[in-house]
């Protein structure tokens, strides 16, 4: 499991320990005084930290594992991602009947909804998640451990359930959402060249 936290406020400055390169730790973040806390929840609200654990399977389910969004725009205060295949990923709770799940994703189809997170899969109606896959439909293999899956794939040469390229695309999409939020305007993105075409500010 995991959690998403709001960033903590920095406390009063303290001397930086000799074994810590504080400038390197801050990276591109604004310069701030060291306050004794280098915890993982200092700068984010979970989108890059916890969000990509959910966004990788959103991209997989929408057939976008090896690409990225082409448009980003805000609606109802949340960033939304539009893909070339016509799918739009809405960065907010889907209105309507609750389907369960805790901070994951809700897939909306013509016959129902399926909510999935790290611990559960819930559907409305319940029968939507019980329909068996037919021959020829994609069957994802199960893995209970990323590290165990990686070691198994080293031995078998099978592709990991979430390899570096997939992780890159999931993290990139969320980074793009951060740029869209900072600029406060819609953006176009070229997922092949990985650039904002004709938009130097972005």
Question: What is each model feature region?
Answer:
Residues 1-202:
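Contiguous beta-strand/loop segments that form the cofactor/metal-binding neighborhood of enzyme cores
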